[in-house]
Swiss-Prot record:
<dbReference type="GO" id="GO:0050660">
    <property type="term" value="F:flavin adenine dinucleotide binding"/>
</dbReference>
<dbReference type="InterPro" id="IPR036188">
    <property type="entry name" value="FAD/NAD-bd_sf"/>
</dbReference>
<dbReference type="InterPro" id="IPR007867">
    <property type="entry name" value="GMC_OxRtase_C"/>
</dbReference>
<protein>
    <recommendedName>
        <fullName>Oxygen-dependent choline dehydrogenase</fullName>
        <ecNumber>1.1.99.1</ecNumber>
        <ecNumber>1.2.1.8</ecNumber>
    </recommendedName>
</protein>
<keyword id="KW-0520">NAD</keyword>
<keyword id="KW-0560">Oxidoreductase</keyword>
<keyword id="KW-0285">Flavoprotein</keyword>
<dbReference type="GO" id="GO:0019285">
    <property type="term" value="P:glycine betaine biosynthetic process from choline"/>
</dbReference>
<comment type="function">
    <text>Involved in the biosynthesis of the osmoprotectant glycine betaine. Catalyzes the oxidation of choline to betaine aldehyde and betaine aldehyde to glycine betaine at the same rate.</text>
</comment>
<dbReference type="Pfam" id="PF05199">
    <property type="entry name" value="GMC_oxred_C"/>
</dbReference>
<comment type="similarity">
    <text>Belongs to the GMC oxidoreductase family.</text>
</comment>
<dbReference type="InterPro" id="IPR012132">
    <property type="entry name" value="GMC_OxRdtase"/>
</dbReference>
<dbReference type="InterPro" id="IPR011533">
    <property type="entry name" value="BetA"/>
</dbReference>
<dbReference type="Pfam" id="PF00732">
    <property type="entry name" value="GMC_oxred_N"/>
</dbReference>
<keyword id="KW-0274">FAD</keyword>
<feature type="active site" description="Proton acceptor">
    <location>
        <position position="473"/>
    </location>
</feature>
<dbReference type="GO" id="GO:0016020">
    <property type="term" value="C:membrane"/>
</dbReference>
Length: 567
């Protein structure tokens, strides 16, 4: 089998490339995916409110675990990644957040990445998006990704939590992806007008499937990329449960879109990576690149949970006898509780004036439960998910063998810097001050977690070590740039070889301020134009917020109540 391009991974980036490259009728593309189809009748992946279900099994989840994390009580921590058409867009939380404009301006300040500024990237965000309330300078109206905005009449806790954030002295913003990310406001989601998950399989692949120049093979686990000298020429993969070896060849390029965990593994198994590691595993060296698998970053987060004095939370939706009605309304009408991911409000703040753009993110949820669906509080409640955005901590990914079925060694090195501890302590204390504001007086019950007894630095640190969790945002493990630890250039081309690119979240040089899916799609849209030889989209001239000397907050309406005095 020979194609012009072989794409490894039908995820958030790979599906974008498959759709865009096959717009050229004379180009042939093979798309390889280790998982299976995105079954449209499987509520676990298609119903937004069921987002916890895919993380509880292995049909759609690689279910990686980290090595014992030394600063987190040596816990082996979850590292769920999507498996199947859609990749992690098939199992993520569907929060449509692009990051802060300053993230991209920072990227563009790095040598070789000058065309990755916010105004360079904004046209590609717009190209990918169809927002349900229409386009503007920041949002698109004709893209493959359906974006739904919160509507009047949604849960009153969303509005109360945003109002509390403003009363605590932080800005309000009406669009976390618009002129000003900083502040509290409504949160958009990747959900279709019919209440279905808007994965890239639905948005991009559905457009491309009818084309004769696209071949999709599922249950195809990539073993390694093949080379002739320094040129990538094809892919060796294992097909089906039997693991039958197959080979496909690429006339032009191999495009690696495996994500921040799989892409460095595949490069290392193919002979591209740290020379010492490859020699130890008897992997023939094609190109020594010490940065492959290094610079690994993620977002860590915690939940602060409270009981709710009024019966307005989503707790009844967790009870089995209410779920058939919710499911029927969603299935036939695409409406109701099932049609939302229930992350309809959130925000970004600076915990201290020293930060030039937000370093803390909030997701508000009108129920008290872990992200993966475990440990649901058996009463009406609500919670704030809070975590730092740009930790200085850096991890790494290393293959353990040549076997593509063996999971790699993953170490994020969470909380390995003093800044991490300052930020998370600040985050807990600021959250308590937000929850104490008058807007939440009608709803705020007792603090369930961390609890009134967790107050001083040592107590907060112990809570963080034991309870902080991944936000499922691994990135940066094959970073763009031209320094000695860079893996690819600003167009995703792997240094030192020909005919090979990496296009996914792994090539971010630094993690962004927010959820990764929208930005991963943007990266793929931008590089797709490069691959096709298209003129880049014209740079935007939209104005955007820069904090400058603006204080991180003003005086709160109410200074924090002692935790023990909460009603």
């Amino acid at each position: 089998m020979e194609y012009d391009y072989i794409i490894i991974g039908a995820g958030s980036a790979g599906n974008v490339l498959a759709a865009r490259l096959t717009e050229d009728a004379d180009v042939t593309v093979l798309l390889l995916e280790a998982g299976g189809p995105d079954y449209r009748l499987d509520f676990r992946t298609q119903m937004p409110a069921a987002l916890a279900f895919p993380l509880q099994g292995k049909r759609y989840n690689w279910a990686y675990e980290t090595d014992p994390e030394p600063h987190m009580n040596n816990r082996r921590m979850e590292c769920g990644r999507g498996k199947g058409l859609g990749g992690s867009s098939l199992i993520n939380g569907m929060c449509y957040i692009r990051g802060n404009a300053m993230d991209f301006d920072h990227w563009a300040s790095l040598s070789g990445l000058e065309d990755w500024s916010y105004l360079d990237c904004l046209p590609y965000f717009r190209k990918a998006e169809t927002r349900d309330i229409g386009p503007n300078d920041f949002h698109g109206g004709e893209g493959p990704v359906s974006v739904t905005t919160p509507k009047i009449g949604n849960n009153p806790l969303f509005h109360a939590m945003v109002a509390a954030g403003v009363q605590a002295g932080y800005p309000r913003t009406d669009d976390l992806n618009g002129y000003q990310q900083e502040g509290f406001g409504p949160m958009d989601r990747t959900v279709t007008p019919k209440g279905r998950r808007a994965s890239t399989a639905r948005g991009y692949l559905d457009q491309a499937r009818p084309r004769n120049n696209l071949t999709i093979i599922t249950h195809a686990l990539t073993d390694r990329i093949l080379f002739e000298g320094k040129r990538a020429t094809g892919v060796r993969y294992l097909k089906g449960d039997a693991g039958t070896g197959q080979t496909a060849y690429a006339r032009r390029e191999v495009l690696l879109c495996g994500g921040a965990i799989a892409s460095p593994q595949i490069l290392q198994r193919s002979g591209i990576g740290p020379a010492e590691l490859l020699q130890r595993l008897d992997i023939p060296l094609v190109q020594a690149l010490p940065g492959v698998g290094e610079n690994l970053q993620d977002h860590l987060e915690m939940y602060l949970q409270y009981s709710c004095k009024q019966p307005v939370s989503l707790y009844p939706a967790l009870l089995w006898f209410n779920q058939p009605k919710i499911g029927i309304e969603w299935l036939f009408n695409g409406t109701g509780v099932g049609a939302s991911n229930q992350f309809e409000a959130g925000g970004f703040i600076r915990s201290r004036d020293a930060f030039t753009w937000p370093n803390i993110q909030y997701h508000f949820l009108p129920v008290a439960i872990n992200y993966n669906g475990s440990n649901a509080v058996k009463e009406h409640g609500f919670q704030a998910h809070v975590g730092s955005m740009r930790s200085p901590s850096r991890g790494r990914i290393q293959v353990k063998s040549k076997d593509p079925r063996q999971h790699p060694s993953i170490l994020f090195n969470y909380m390995s810097s003093e800044q991490d501890w300052h930020e998370f302590r600040d985050a807990i204390r600021i959250t308590r001050e937000i929850i104490a504001q008058p807007a939440l007086d009608p709803y705020r019950g007792r603090e369930i977690s961390p609890g009134a007894n967790v107050q001083n630095d040592d107590e907060l640190d112990a809570f963080i070590r034991e309870h902080a969790e991944t936000a499922y945002h691994p990135s940066c493990s094959c970073k763009m740039g031209d320094d000695k630890m860079a893996v690819v250039d600003g167009q995703g081309r792997v240094h030192g070889v020909q005919g090979l690119r990496v296009v996914d979240a792994s090539i971010m040089p630094q993690i962004i301020t927010g959820n990764l899916n929208a930005t991963t799609i943007m990266i793929a849209e931008k590089i797709a134009d490069r691959i096709r030889g298209c003129q880049p989209l014209a740079k935007s001239n939209a104005a955007y917020f820069i904090a400058g000397d603006t204080p991180a907050r003003t005086s709160p309406v109410r200074h924090s109540l002692p935790v023990t005095s909460y009603p």
